[in-house]
């Protein structure tokens, strides 16, 4: 931080409000301190945390870059999920069909897909309809069963479109297709991150339902499409930087936000029972603090669902309260988006004393 300037500690209700608070503080810094978007870095412990931040930035028209990874909606597992949803809304979407017909793996190879393409052209049928008659293509046994299962899932959820809202439909779909089970049961480290991203995607759908209680799947897909299209209009160089704390090593920015400062998230739960791992997390927190040339914002939420359960974090990170009290200025924030109050009036920051309770 600048000489004598305290670190801002911002309390929010949940991750939606946390992202909204970042946008609010960032816009205030730009207006009052005449900063550029490129002056800011938003740091987080795990990649899946970027989703709520990206959504808030896109809605506010704030350009950003992801360092050391893909933007949330460009990650393969998320594109696969959106492919499923697009196919359910429009079963004639052959591009989405080819993308997801063997996701999760169900033994449908490219040769089988090619047979379906040829059969659809020959019979002048939609490709999705061909899946229901595998015997006409000489496909039998497990592959025939897999094609029929996939066809029945798409047909079932297409017929459920008028009956279920987006949240209900998406949650039922990821369970029935086995997407959640596939990633959760995998021992590969990259699949654990993909599982976290899928669960974060579901949280994004839940947030859409809060904003749009009667919203259907088509409306949700329109919003995702609109938000991702906005990226193409942004200045390539003047962008906010989003990245994990690990990716931030060696970089410096005038203003740094460290988000998700709750025990169990930062430090991670897996580090709480090991002195060595906890010390490594503490060093990572120090790395985050020292990325800032002028100003640091420390962010935490009172409620944040853990991946794969309804359990909440909510305990402020021990790293925050290991810092000298006179170096912190606690700021409660109330989101204009949710209208939830955590001290203060909607849409403003309210300074309060730091308490060690």
Set out the residue ranges of the language-model regions.
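Conserved short internal alpha-helix adjacent to the catalytic or cofactor-binding core
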Residues: 5, 58-65, 70-104
């Amino acid at each position: 931080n600048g000489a004598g300037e305290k670190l801002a500690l911002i309390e929010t209700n949940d991750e939606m409000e946390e992202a909204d608070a970042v946008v609010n503080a960032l816009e205030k810094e730009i207006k009052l301190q005449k900063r550029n978007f490129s002056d800011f870095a938003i740091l987080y412990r795990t990649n899946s945390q970027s989703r709520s931040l990206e959504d808030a930035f896109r809605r506010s028209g704030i350009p950003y870059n992801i360092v050391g990874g893909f933007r949330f909606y460009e990650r393969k597992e998320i594109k696969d999920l959106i492919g499923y949803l697009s196919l359910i809304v429009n079963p004639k979407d052959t591009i989405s069909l080819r993308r997801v017909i063997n996701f999760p793996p169900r033994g449908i190879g490219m040769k089988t897909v090619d047979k379906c393409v040829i059969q659809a052209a020959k019979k002048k049928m939609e490709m999705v309809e061909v899946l229901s008659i595998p015997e006409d293509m000489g496909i039998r046994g497990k592959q025939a069963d897999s094609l029929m299962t996939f066809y029945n899932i798409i047909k079932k959820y297409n017929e459920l479109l008028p009956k279920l809202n987006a949240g209900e439909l998406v949650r039922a779909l990821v369970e029935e297709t086995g997407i959640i089970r596939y990633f959760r049961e995998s021992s590969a480290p990259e699949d654990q991150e993909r599982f976290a991203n899928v669960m974060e995607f579901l949280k994004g759908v839940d947030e859409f339902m809060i904003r749009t209680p009667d919203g259907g799947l088509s409306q949700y897909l329109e919003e995702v499409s609109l938000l991702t299209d906005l990226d193409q209009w942004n200045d390539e160089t003047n962008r906010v930087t989003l990245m994990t704390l690990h990716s931030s090593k060696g970089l410096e920015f005038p203003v740094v936000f460290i988000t998700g400062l709750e025990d169990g998230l930062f430090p991670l739960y897996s580090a709480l029972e090991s002195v060595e791992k906890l010390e490594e997390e503490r060093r990572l927190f120090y790395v985050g603090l020292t990325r800032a040339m002028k100003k640091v914002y420390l962010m935490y939420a009172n409620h944040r669902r853990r991946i794969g359960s309804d359990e909440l974090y909510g305990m402020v990170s021990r790293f925050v309260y290991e810092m000298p009290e006179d170096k912190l200025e606690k700021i409660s924030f109330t989101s204009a988006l949710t209208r939830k109050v955590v001290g203060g009036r909607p849409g403003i920051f309210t300074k309060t004393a730091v308490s060690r309770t």
